[in-house]
């Protein structure tokens, strides 16, 4: 699981940077009470997420093994497990990136506590599903990855729902 983190982080960093820029713009527009520009910025960032997620997922899926080999991950079973984990994570990477974008939007709106709450909920979901997928179902590393993406996608969708219900822009 930890072996694939540097690759996942490297390929996700672009969206983290975009999210940071959006946070700054949203904060400026929201502070100026220009809700139309807040809305445009939020829509633009979600559009960038949707458009960019497919190429990012495909790049991550297809480069998983070559990048793990470049990192000299041993081929004693560790490589296969790390590759399985990474492929599943990249299939569901929209949850991670979507959560980060929602977090940036909320921070730009002056609400940093709600994204922390969604993160805590995702953590509880992840722990419960880790136990379910690895003990009774025995999915191993694939179960851990599946639990992670389900928790992240749930957290992202909670955020989308909250932002749409709470903020009128």
What are these regions (language model features)?
Residues 1-55, 96-115:
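Small-residue-rich hydrophobic transmembrane alpha-helices
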Residues 10, 126-130, 156-160:
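Hydrophobic transmembrane alpha-helices of multi-pass small-molecule transporters
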Residues 17, 58, 123-127, 153:
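Hydrophobic/small/kink-forming positions within alpha-helical transmembrane segments
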Residues 22, 63-64, 102, 129-130, ...:
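Hydrophobic/aromatic residues in alpha-helical transmembrane segments
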Residues 26-92, 138-169:
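Short alpha-helical transmembrane segments in multi-pass integral membrane proteins
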Residues 49, 105-129, 146-149:
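Alpha-helical transmembrane segments of multi-pass membrane transporters/permeases
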Residues 71, 75, 79, 89, ...:
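Cytoplasmic helix-loop-helix junction between adjacent transmembrane helices
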